[in-house]
Structures are given as structure tokens and as C-alpha cells.
Regions:
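A SIS-like phosphosugar-recognition module
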Residues: 44, 167-168, 177-181, 187-188, ...
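Conserved short alpha-helical segments that host acidic/polar catalytic motifs at enzyme active sites
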Residues: 1-253, 261-296, 335, 448-451, ...
């Protein structure tokens, strides 16, 4: 959620710090600040609001120093004010701390520190860490690294911390517990950040940090220890994408760019997944034929849009592999004593690999004896590292808060898993797998067809921009599409939007319909259970009560009672979510633009939710 950057090296530190924070804006924030390593007393500047407020406050008198830390805050403890913004400092103004996460025992720490004479100036949990570190550093004769190790032992919660002290301004110390932190290795300069996007302009060499590992960074060295001070061998890797992938590339917004990148993202996730003898290739699962055939249940855990991908997984895997599938909201999963045993496969879906609710559910599942397969878009993130296996999607960096291409690649990933499991356990013939895979390979081109005809949809959006309620209806595989359409509209347009299963309409939701209420219906096609006849009845029901009906339907499908029809290419029924979701993304995007909202950084939201 919060964005964290640290820099030490030959550059004027304000430049990599501000640029790094700019590249982390997608994470969501409501204030920003920096601490520069000026000798004697740190230079601190922080402002509520956008990063531009901070930039505008930095005048020509800004000191030219070569180390510092920067932060974008997403408020949890205390409102979004200048005083609550990070960095937070000790009473001497010599030690500064930035923090992502939550310190659960901060009130207890604050009381103890105030009793010792420390003066607090904010409402945050973070300020307690600054004062605690100040005391511990003195106990360790100025050793900030040793102080950090002891501080972490005293803290409860999930967090990433970075600290700097004016007496050794070129040294930055960091630690992570259940929250992301990565080190960037430069030439005579080094970086720390919550995401590699912050420093990819400067280096593509990175180090992944493990749980409770403390990193001490200077311009020419990076040392990592555990909480007992024992050295840890760094795990270096090369970042696979470049800085241009985190630029808008001529599009008005990152979200629009990412919508148009979906054909390539889907194609990249599919490439090379069928062998010459028509076998789905998923070596990453690390499961033998016997282990797959012994599976009795699959549980999918996810949050937000990824949860909707999980719902699609249920339809696909049960259809193809004949294995029962439960789909759980990750934040609820571990609080009800779920039944898990070695015959249970847990599929954890997370774009960032750092979603805290999903990570906690993964740990609970593993402790209960389940095998965990992660579906993730971010290499070397925490959830893949703690899972038994990982299937990486190939969406590339997704900067906009609202998920688009990451969601579609997650759906493609669950299709591949379903086909593989069904093929191995004998529920699908090789010829069936071959034919379905060929249909999957046609999806990128079909998405392009949809994107080539979005202009009428943009015009349509303007006629609905002033409505304050929009309802979405779907049946079977169209139900998660309806939920996703409603979520996107809530996130981006700040409109009350709800998705319902069509069969539930008469059980309450129809009471919401009045004159002029927009209703978007996803018309099923090609289903085995006569669903094609059910949704038209729902359309007539809402139209009779004054609704303005928009229908998403396949080319050639007969539609009655709709004010507007959005056509999508023909595809097998289970693959329709990949296509039907795209016009709903465009609809939500255009609604946000017309209403003047911040498309890439919607209010109150964060890209990667790293607190519970």
C-alpha cells in the first residue's frame, strides 16, 4: 500500500527519491515525504495530498546530499495530514523512519516511551518506532543495524521499515516482516524500495529479502543479517522488464494502456503450453500423476478481482477435471477452521504476490497440511516464495490500481490448470484438450476485435455518466463477469454498482429497479442447461420496471428488449469471461473519465493491499 524508497550513492538523492515515489504512486497514497541525510540534523519535508505538493514545496534551497529515504503514505492510524505523513523523526531530529504496514502494539510502546520523556507529534503508529530506534541505537553505541534488530523483536504486526541517521547519513537500514522490500544494486549506488518499479530506471539487478531479514546499505555495500546478527547470503536476480513498461506510452492513463495490452498479455501467458503430443505443459506445478489423481478438493483463495478469477476457476476445473472447487475470500478463509488435508490443493491468486490477506491464508493452509499453488504476476514476491509451486502469469507490470490485464491472465492461468488436471486424471481426452487450447489461442485476436470497436461504447457511456446506481446481471459463467463489472465501476466511477446472479433478481434486487436505472446483462451463449432462455426473461423483468438495459451478447445472438447491445466474438461458453470483461473495463474507464475521477489512482484505494 504505502510506497517506500531509499537511496545512497553519488546522485543528488532528491532525484531518485522523487522519481521512485512517482513510480510507486500506483500503490495508492494520500501524502508524501522525504528525509535527506544532511549531517548533524536530517532535512525533512512532507506534505498531505499528491506527490506534486511535496515537489512544489522543495525549492532551490534544497540541500544537495547523496542519501535519503522517501515515502508515500496510505493512512491507517491518523488522518492524511502533513504531521501524520512520513518520515517520522526522534526528538533530536537526527533519526528518521518510514514504514509500510501496521504496528499492532504501538499504543503500548508509545506509553512506555512517553513515560521516558519522549514527545510525540503525530497520531501514527510509525512514530513509536522512530523513538524506540533512537533509544536502542544509543544502547548499541550508535549501531543503527543492531538497534533495528532489537526493535523488530519488540514490534508486533506486519511491516517494512527503513531508517537513516544524521551521524552516518550514507547508511540506510531496512527490514521486512510480511511486507515487501527489495534491494536494487547499482554501480557505486544502491536502492531499497517496496517495488522494483521505483529503481528500474537506474538498475535491473535486485536482491530479494526474506522474512525478518535486516539489510544495511551504503553506496558500495549491502549486508544482510537475520535478527540474531548472523549473515545471510543475498539472493540476486535480474529484473525481466524495463523502465518503458512502467510508462504510459502515449495513452492518457495507465489503465487504458493496460486494457490495450491485454491481447499480448493473454498470448504471452498461453505461449508454449501445449506440447507436440497435445499435452498441457505445466511443469511448474511439481505434481506427479499420482498426486493429481489423489486430489479430492481444490480451494481457491483470493481478494478483489482475483476472487472473480477464482470463481471462473470453479466452473472450468469442475467441468474439465471433475474435482470439487470451493472459492473463498482470503480475508475470511482462516477464521472458520477450513477442512484441509494432503488431498486438498489450495490455489492462491494474487497479482502482486504481497496481498496480506491472501498471504495469511496461504500460511494457514500450509500449516494445516495443504499443498499451495500460487498464481502470481510478480517474480520473487512473498506468496510465490512461500507456496509449494507457482504459475506466473505474463501480464507485465500493471500500474493502474484497477486490475485489467492481470485479471485476464489469471483467468487464462486457471484455464490451463483445469485443462492439465482434467487431462492427467483422464476426464479430458487429448483431442479435447487440443481443441480447447486452439480456442484459447484465438482469444488474443478476439480481444483485439473488441478493442477496435470501442468508440460506440465510449459514446454510450456519456449517456449514463450521471446515474448513481448501475446493476449487473449474469448467470453461470457470466455471474463472476457481472461481479467484476460492478467492482470496476465502484472502484473507478465511485458509483453504487452491484452484480447479481440473474436467478436471484426476484429474491430482492429487483426492488432496486426504478425508472431509468441502468442494468447491464451478460447474455450467456452455448451453455448446456438452456440458460440462453433464462436471461432474456430477466431482461424483460427489469425493462418492465423502467430499467435502461445494456446487453453484452455474442455476435449473431438474438436480443430483445435492450436499449443497447454490445457484441463480442463467438467463443466456447467457458471462455466468454475473457471477452465479456473487456467492454465492462472500457465502460468503467470511460465513466471515470467523464466524471472527472483519477482513473489510475482512485480515491481510498491501493494497488497492493499489504495490511490486513
Amino acid at each position: 500500500m504505502c510506497g517506500i524508497v531509499g537511496y545512497t550513492g553519488p546522485q543528488s538523492a532528491s532525484h531518485p527519491l522523487i522519481e521512485g515515489l512517482r513510480r510507486l504512486e500506483y500503490r495508492g497514497y494520500d501524502s508524501a515525504g522525504i528525509a535527506l541525510g544532511t549531517p548533524g540534523k536530517l532535512f525533512i519535508q512532507k506534505k498531505a495530498g499528491k506527490l506534486s505538493n511535496l515537489e512544489n514545496s522543495l525549492d532551490e534551497s534544497l540541500p544537495v546530499v547523496h542519501s535519503g529515504i522517501g515515502h508515500t503514505r496510505w493512512a491507517t492510524h491518523g488522518g492524511p495530514t502533513d504531521g501524520n505523513a512520513h518520515p517520522h523523526v526522534d526528538n533530536e531530529g537526527k533519526l528518521a523512519v518510514i514504514h509500510n504496514g501496521i504496528i499492532e502494539n504501538y499504543t503500548e510502546l508509545r506509553s512506555q516511551l512517553e513515560a521516558k520523556g519522549h514527545k510525540f507529534s503525530s497520531e501514527t503508529d510509525t512514530e513509536s518506532v522512530a523513538h524506540l530506534l533512537s533509544d536502542l541505537r544509543k544502547e548499541h553505541n550508535g549501531d543503527l543495524t543492531a538497534a533495528m534488530r532489537d526493535a523488530v523483536k519488540a514490534l508486533r504486526g506486519s511491516f517494512t521499515l527503513l531508517a537513516i541517521h544524521a551521524d552516518a547519513p550514507d547508511v540506510i537500514v531496512g527490514v521486512r516482516r510480511n511486507s515487501p522490500l527489495v534491494v536494487g544494486l547499482g554501480d557505486g549506488e544502491n536502492f531499497m524500495a517496496s517495488d522494483v518499479a521505483a529503481f528500474i530506471e537506474f538498475t535491473k539487478r535486485a536482491i530479494e529479502l526474506g522474512q525478518d531479514e535486516v539489510v544495511t546499505m551504503t553506496p558500495t555495500s549491502v549486508e544482510i543479517t537475520d535478527l540474531d546478527g548472523k549473515p545471510v547470503k543475498p539472493k540476486q536476480y535480474e529484473i525481466s522488464w524495463d523502465a518503458s513498461a512502467a510508462q504510459k506510452g502515449g495513452f492518457a492513463h495507465f489503465m487504458l494502456k493496460e486494457i490495450f495490452e491485454q491481447p499480448k498479455a493473454v498470448a504471452d501467458t498461453l505461449i508454449g503450453r501445449l506440447s507436440d503430443n497435445n499435452q498441457i505443459v505445466l511443469d511448474e506445478l511439481h505434481m506427479s500423476t499420482e498426486e493429481i489423481r489423489s486430489l479430492k478438493k481444490i480451494t481457491v483463495i483470493a481478494c478483489g478481482s482475483a476472487y472473480h478469477a477464482g470463481m471462473v476457476a470453479k466452473y472450468a476445473i469442475e467441468k474439465w477435471a471433475k474435482i470439487p472447487v470451493d472459492v473463498e475470500i482470503a480475508s475470511e478463509f482462516r477464521y472458520r477452521d477450513p477442512i484441509i488435508d494432503p488431498s486438498t490443493l489450495i490455489i492462491a491468486i494474487s497479482q502482486s504476490g504481497e496481498t496480506m490477506d491472501t498471504l495469511m491464508a496461504v500460511r494457514h493452509a500450509k500449516a494445516a497440511g495443504g499443498r499451495v499453488l500460487a498464481i502470481c504476476n510478480t517474480n520473487s514476491s512473498t506468496i510465490p516464495r512461500e507456496s509449494d509451486a507457482v504459475l506466473y502469469t505474463h501480464a507485465g507490470p500493471e500500474i493502474a490500481v484497477a486490475s485489467t490485464k492481470a485479471l485476464l491472465t489469471q483467468i487464462i492461468a486457471v484455464y490451463l490448470i483445469g485443462l492439465h488436471l482434467g487431462q492427467v486424471n483422464g476426464s479430458l481426452k487429448d483431442s479435447e484438450v487440443r481443441d480447447l487450447y486452439k480456442e484459447l489461442l484465438e482469444l488474443p485476436g478476439k480481444i483485439e476485435q473488441i478493442l477496435e470497436t470501442v468508440e460506440p461504447l465510449r459514446e454510450l457511456t456519456r449517456t449514463f455518466a450521471q446515474n448513481n446506481t448501475v446493476l449487473f446481471l449474469g448467470r453461470n459463467i457470466g455471474y463472476p463477469v457481472a461481479l467484476e463489472g460492478a467492482l470496476k465501476l465502484k472502484e473507478l466511477a465511485y458509483i453504487h454498482a452491484e452484480g447479481f446472479a440473474g436467478g436471484e433478481l426476484k429474491h430482492g434486487p429487483i426492488a432496486l429497479i426504478d425508472q431509468g436505472t441502468p442494468v447491464i446483462a451478460i447474455l450467456p451463449a452455448g451453455h448446456e442447461h438452456a440458460l440462453d432462455e433464462k436471461m432474456p426473461s430477466n431482461i424483460q423483468e427489469v425493462k418492465a420496471r423502467g430499467a435502461r438495459v445494456i446487453v453484452i451478447a455474442e455476435e449473431g445472438a438474438h436480443v430483445e428488449g435492450a436499449e443497447h447491445v454490445i457484441r463480442i466474438p463467438i467463443a466456447p461458453a467457458l471462455f466468454q469471461p475473457v471477452l465479456a470483461t473487456v467492454p465492462l473495463q472500457v465502460f468503467a474507464y470511460e465513466m471515470a473519465v467523464v466524471r472527472g475521477n483519477d482513473v489510475d489512482q482512485p480515491r481510498n484505494l491501493a494497488k497492493s493491499v499489504t495490511v490486513e
